[in-house]
Structure formats: C-alpha cells, structure tokens
Amino acid sequence: MSDSFYRYDVIVIGGGHAGTEAALAAARAGARTLLLTHNIETVGAMSCNPAIGGIGKGHLVKEIDALGGAMAKAADLAGIQWRTLNASKGPAVRATRCQADRNLYRSAIRRIVEAQPNLTVFQAAVDDLIIHNGAAEGDSVRGVITQTGLRFEATAVVLTAGTFLAGKIHVGETQYAAGRMGDPPATTLAARLRERPFAIDRLKTGTPPRIDGRTLDYTMMDEQPGDDPLPVMSFMGQVSDHPTQVSCWITHTTEQTHDIIRGALHRSPLYSGQIEGIGPRYCPSIEDKVVRFADKTSHQIFVEPEGLDVTEIYPNGISTSLPFDVQLALVRSIRGFAQAHITRPGYAIEYDFFDPRGLKASLETKAVGGLFFAGQINGTTGYEEAAAQGLLAGLNAARQAQALPAWSPRRDEAYLGVLVDDLITHGTTEPYRMFTSRAEYRLQLREDNADLRLTGVGRAMGLVDDARWARFSSKQEAVQRETARLSALWATPGNALGREVVDTLGVPMSRETNVLDLIKRPELSYAALMRVPTLGPGVDDAQVAEQVEIGVKYAGYLNRQRDEIARQQRHETTPIPEGFDYAGVRGLSMEVQQKLERVRPQSIGQAQRIPGMTPAAISLLLVHLERARRSQVA
C-alpha cells in the first residue's frame, strides 16, 4: 500500500449518525477524509427507535439538509409513515416526523457515503489516538492507531463513538461489556481517553424489547395513519421518493402491567444501584414512569413497524432493563399483546461521555488541538442531535486542515447554534434533547426557512452542491417575485379587484388595501387568495407559497424579533482571548472567576449565558478587554 493510504486530512471514528454526517461534511468541504467504523454493515444503523424528526428534532434535520447533509434525504427514501406534529399551531413549532424502515434508511446512508468523493471507508476499531505533546503550542492530535496496529495520520480527528466508550449493557442483574447489543465496546480507546485531561462521566440510555408483529391483536388498538398529503423532509425531496406507507398503532399499559413492574423493582438495575449513569429525562423507562407517575393507571404505547419487509415492531414507550422474565410478563399484560413474542429483549446501556464545556463552539476540544467530539459522547440523546453535531464537527475539522477559520452558527441563526451553545456553556448532567422551547428566537428558526437561513452559508463553505444551490436560488427568486407581484396590487371597495375579493372570499372591504395585507387577516391564506380570478392561480410550488404567506402574516413579530437580536448582538461576538487571566480583572468575585475559569467562554455572549453571571461582571470584562485592545493598538 502507498503512503497515501495512511495519510488523510480528516479521520472520523464511528459510522453512526454523527460519524456519517461528519465524514460527508468534511469530504464535501474538500478534505481528504477517512471514515473508520468497526463494522461497515452497520454504517447509518438506527440503534434504537426507527424514526427521524419530531419537535425540535425535525428542525435540526431540516438544518442538516439545508447544509447539504444526508439525514433528510435518507428519511425521504425510508419513511413509511409521515406526520406533521403541531400542525394546528404556528409555523415556529410545527415539526416533521417519519417512521422509517430501518433497513431502507441504513441502505440509503451507505449509498450516500459510498458515492461521496474525497471519502474513504475502512473497517477497523480504533484503540488509541496519536497525540503530539507540544511544549509551547499544547497537545494536538496527529492520527489514530487501530486494534490491529495500523497507524493512520491526519491533521484533524473527529470522535463519534456513541455508546461504545466503555459501554455496558444491563438486563436485570446481568451486565456485560458492549457498544450496543451484538457489538463490542471500545474499551481500550475509552481507557486511553481517560488518561487525557478530559472531564469524563457516565450516562445511560435504554431501548424496549422488540416484538413479532404477527403475534399482536390490532383489533384492541387504535390505528394511527400518516398524514395526507404526505410531507417530505428534504428541501430536495418529493413525495414520490417515499416507499409504501403503513399505519402505526396506539395501545396502553394496564394496571396489571404496573403491578408486575412494581413487584420487580428490586430486580431492576435502575433501582438496585447497579446502574450509575443518568438516563434521558424525556424518554424514561417504563419502570421510571410507573414509579414517578404512581397515580396513573395506564401509559400510552406507540406500536411502530420496524420496516416493510420485517415482522418486528418497536413498542415506543416501554424502554426497560428489567430481567427478561419480567419483560415477557409486562409485555403480555399490555392491551393487544397477550400472545406477544419478544424477538429481542429490552436493555439499558451505560457509556462514557465528556463534559461538553471542554469544547469550543467548533466542537474542537480545548485540551487537544485538532480533536473534535460529536454526538452522544457530548451528552446528547437522539439521532438528530448527533447528526447535527457531526456535520458541524466534520466541517470544522476540514476547515482546520485547510487552515481556514472555524464556523459555528449563533443562537439566532440555527437550532444547531442553540444546541452547541447550551452544551458548551451549561454542560449537562443528563442526556440533552432538543426542543423548540430551548430556542428564544424560534419564530425565526422554523423548519420551513432552514434553507433560507443556512444554504447560502453552506454554499460558501463548499457544503452545498450545484443541484441544491440551483433549487434554492430558484425558490428564493420565486418567493421574491411572487411577493413583489402581490405587493403591487391594490383592492378598493370600488375597483374590479376589490369586488372580486368580496364576492369570492366573502370578506368586507371598507378601504383601499394592499393585496399582501389581505393575507394578514386570520381567516385568509395565500391559497384562499389565489381563488380570486385576477390573483390566481399563483405559484405551484408549496414551499414558495408557504414562504410568501409566513413572511406576510408574521412580519410584525419577525421584525420585532430581529430588532431584539440586533440589540443582543451588540457584544455577542466580542471575543475573549484564549488563556485570558480572569484573576487579573479587578472587581470580579471569586465565585464569578471560578465560573469563568471552568467554562472558559470564547465570547462575551457565551459568558453572559453562564448560570450566575451578573451584568456587573460582564461590564468589568468589557472594560478590561477594551483596555487590553487599546494598549495593543498603542
């Protein structure tokens, strides 16, 4: 093999949702990239729930897509049941979710990975990092060493190990080392990382038992069909991309289920002290639900198909690590599950994660230059959160290899910006999940405008290909053209257009009104307006029509939010130099100094969001930074 086989710009460790997006982003950005995975067959595998999107999560998927990522495209090719959540609410909180055929999804991701120029995939477990100990410039990564002793060199390395770092599975009293059921853990790599100056702790997550769908009685459940018309996830997607559609089903636990669980809590690793890691608050185990909500006589379960060509179903809502005999009893006590056959047991898994306050906004570690972390190892939960971090880390790894400045979106620019800022500023003690409520500027950060917010940025950094750019540019021009067309038209009580509006829509017309302003009326929409003969038929692209309508209906709110953002941005990006001496700022309390030393914020904006930070402390920092700037100029 030639030396070039062992030398890359960027190496990505792990082929899950974070790893694939990281490798694809680095390669799209022009870096020669190597993706190392312990098993090529599991690249893009959905380890837990076979679904993509949801509240907050769908927003991240749209942002990944707007930046040229793969997740939305794969979801469109694999989604077998589609829903728009919060459809009756405002556009800021509407979210797309699909039930996915896990085999179709994995195959789609693998095809995308294998077709990507600049990207090489190699099957190998990584046991160690090659770290250069620089006396002056600090530690920096130089490559990796595999389980078989191969050494691959790179300028930047992205670690996306998921639950594999010292992973330990629990089923009742039984526990054993694993990355997920059926896969070995990264034990040696975890031990090597613990020798480095990283703050490491343990988290846990879990998954429910899988069931043979042929053994269920669906007559005892409520059918949950998908939406009609079907949504799409990718801005490049079409409904024709979707495979055959199927329904999900809803059932409930019973009082017998809860009695079985209560009677076996002493055998639960969650309650016996066997599991030390903290689990996800918003995806609790069925044991947790029964204990925490003791007054409830039943809990809802979503019966979700795993795919079109398999019989397994995913019972969403009964994640458990109880012993198998208890799992079988509790499953068979659920409505419609009396004859259920379990195909795989549920389990909990504990794993190492790193305090994300040890990361820069680029997701590069502060301790080791050129080393980036993404995904569950940063304390998050969920495919979407992992994939979004992967894209950002992969992009910035490529930019570092090319000696370009790092990029990270602000909180007002993307949910990805909210996610990263929350992690690196506040850290986390439990698996972090994205919600729309975490974003203070969510009216600006909608699913529908993710491309308008990010595709231009992605194009400038090499993430967006010509086809996506052409589609985006065409859409942007169409929105501007249609908005201009309607804004040039006026309806009055006495002119022909005004009479058409009154006759067609049945709305009163007492004064001259701009046609665009008609859309601001709660009872009117763009589609309704296009029924007026002179105005219709309008644009046939639903995305364009949606942008025209939202831009008009919410103009006042959006303008106010932009003004608020402008005020906030005054000092948001004021940089704080690396290695800044907080002890040298006179007037800072010891408590504030300790908080600042712990987080080491990169900007005044980040410093402002540290819990317990006071306006007075920020003022002192600004004064000190300004003095330092003036002294340098002088």
Curated annotation (Swiss-Prot):
Pfam family, one: GIDA_C_1st
One GO term of the biological process aspect: tRNA methylation
Intracellular or extracellular location(s): Cytoplasm
Cofactor: FAD
PROSITE patterns: GIDA_1, GIDA_2
Keyword vocabulary terms for this entry: Cytoplasm, FAD, Flavoprotein, NAD, tRNA processing
Species, as recorded: Xanthomonas campestris pv. campestris (strain ATCC 33913 / DSM 3586 / NCPPB 528 / LMG 568 / P 25)
InterPro entries found in the cross-reference section: FAD/NAD-bd_sf (IPR036188), GIDA_C_N (IPR049312), MnmG (IPR004416), MnmG-rel (IPR002218), MnmG-rel_CS (IPR020595), MnmG_C (IPR026904), MnmG_C_subdom (IPR047001), MnmG_C_subdom_sf (IPR044920)
SMART domains referenced in this protein's UniProt entry, alphabetically: GIDA_assoc_3
Residues where FAD binds: G14, G15, G16, H17, A18, G19
GN (gene name): mnmG
Functional description taken from the UniProt entry: NAD-binding protein involved in the addition of a carboxymethylaminomethyl (cmnm) group at the wobble position (U34) of certain tRNAs, forming tRNA-cmnm(5)s(2)U34.
Name of the featured protein: tRNA uridine 5-carboxymethylaminomethyl modification enzyme MnmG
GO molecular function annotation: flavin adenine dinucleotide binding
Annotated family: Belongs to the MnmG family.
GO cellular component assignments: cytosol
